[in-house]
Design a protein with these regions (language model features):
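Secretory targeting and sorting signals
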Residues: 1-29
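N-terminal module-boundary/linker segments of secreted carbohydrate-active enzymes
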Residues: 20, 25-69
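Exposed alpha-helical structural elements
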Residues: 38-44, 74-78, 183
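A general structural signal for short secondary-structure junctions and capping/turn motifs
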Residues: 47, 68-70, 91, 141-145
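N-terminal carbohydrate-binding/catalytic regions of secreted carbohydrate-active enzymes
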Residues: 55-96
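Domain-level detector of nuclease and nuclease-like folds
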Residues: 99-190
Length: 190
């Protein structure tokens, strides 16, 4: 995803990179993004060009929530990774636990109120070049647990974000701007 479009992202990222958080969160989080300096290097390496269209886009073209381990799919794996005291049933569905939505600073105790957000939305990836990827590569992108592409957040914050990029949406929790920008750059650099 290294050569994909970054539409109006540079100003937002430059501002976000100026706010480096010095504390470690007291909740689970996806894999740590690269450092601020590495993120800046990645950002400088990205190609900026006109964004494509959503013609032909469908979420179904990004097979997601595949089985990761046993009978746990990607969604369930992220719920366990990002939650605390998560208990699952025999089908790997979360029956209890707590999830902190960093986007809007909300604690959730019912997994049905938790969405798994794609940091770089699938439709945005499509407009940035994923329309030319193989189905296998789109599946890997939609289920990526190696980078901070997937994060458990409140359903309301995820729906507010929708398919928007950082020029149109940032987390309501302004303390999250820097981490969000670094996550976005890391996924885009891939």
């Amino acid at each position: 995803m290294r050569r994909l479009v970054i539409r109006s992202l540079l100003p937002a990222v430059a501002i976000a990179l100026a706010f480096v958080l010095g504390t470690t969160p007291a909740y689970a989080y996806p894999p740590d993004p690269p450092s601020v300096s590495t993120s800046q290097t990645y950002l400088n390496a990205l190609t900026v060009r006109a964004e494509g269209s959503t013609d032909g886009y469908s979420r179904d073209l990004f097979p997601h929530w595949h089985i990761v381990s046993g009978n746990c799919d990607t969604r369930e794996t992220v719920l366990k990774r990002d939650g605390t005291n998560v208990v699952t049933d025999s089908a790997c569905h979360a029956t209890s636990g707590r999830w902190y939505s960093v986007y809007d600073s909300v604690w959730l105790t019912d997994s049905s109120g938790v969405d798994i957000d794609h940091i770089v939305p699938l439709a945005e990836a499509w407009k940035s070049g994923a329309d030319k990827w193989t189905t296998s590569r789109r599946e890997q992108f939609a289920n990526d647990l190696d980078r901070a592409q997937l994060i458990a957040v409140s359903a309301s914050s995820n729906r507010s974000k929708g398919d928007k990029d950082p020029s149109l949406w940032k987390p309501p929790n302004t303390n999250e701007y820097c981490m969000y920008a670094r996550d976005w750059i890391w996924v885009k650099y891939y």
